[in-house]
Amino acid sequence: MTTCDVLVIGGGVIGLSIARELRRRRPNARIVLIEKESSCGAHASGRNSGVLHAGFYYSPDSLKAKFTRLGCEQLTAYCEQKQIPLNKCGKLVVAKDAGDLKSLDELFRRGQANGIELQELTDIEAKKIEPRVKTYQRALFSPRTATVNPLLVVNAMQDDAQREGVQILVDTAYVGKNDRRVRTTHDSIEAGYVVNAAGLYADKIAMEYGFSEKYRILPFKGLYLYSNEPPGSFRTNIYPVPDLRNPAFLRA
């Protein structure tokens, strides 16, 4: 049986980041991370758009706005430190019709309140950034938004975590718990603390520990359409004005 001070469940960006930070704060602690797949980042952390969002979608008094801004700054610095290719192409937010202009103004206000650099553009100015963009009268441009290959980030974090002394056990899935012991597909692990970073299954594990009784994770799958144009055909990311009631959902 394995014993540790802290067990982290889940080898995505969140789990790896937490494990590294715990190791930094408690250098003498034994930190173990388990990942059910054969490598870290095999799910959402390694299969996403790789956009480092600047943080102007969310209400400025929210933790999400704060952490998005700080996360963009810190992850940009991490990529530069690790020499991970970073495309600082920015992002255009475009309006479909007159009904989007009020929301566009609200996004600009949120950006200012949260200390995010944003530029208000006319449709003509937007076309200077991306000639093929279509917008109704106005657009917003976020120069701080960038894109990166998410798997390169995960791989770098995994290498750093292991070098810093975190024990990573791949092909090791969480099965259940018995008091202080966590059962996995290979062995039992006795841990002083358990950190639940299990992604889309985090709610199920949380319920076994007496949490998340009133919450459920509702997964959504994003679909990508590929064109036959060569990479780099567009100069920047182009996003529609989101539904500000829930910015995670983009309107077509």
Feature map (PLM): residue ranges:
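Beta1/beta-strand and adjacent pyrophosphate-binding region of the FAD-binding site
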Residues: 1-14, 32
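Conserved Rossmann-like nucleotide-cofactor binding loop
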Residues: 14, 39, 201
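Flavin-dependent oxidoreductases
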Residues: 17, 184-252
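Gly/Ala-rich phosphate-binding loop of Rossmann-like dinucleotide-binding domains
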Residues: 19, 23, 160
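Glycine-rich FAD pyrophosphate-binding loop
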Residues: 23-45
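Short loop/edge segments at beta-strand edges and connector loops
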Residues: 35, 88, 122-123, 170-172
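Dinucleotide-binding Rossmann-like beta1-alpha1 core, especially the glycine-rich loop
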Residues: 50-125, 129, 136
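Helical element adjacent to the flavin cofactor pocket in flavoenzyme catalytic cores
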Residues: 139-193, 197, 201
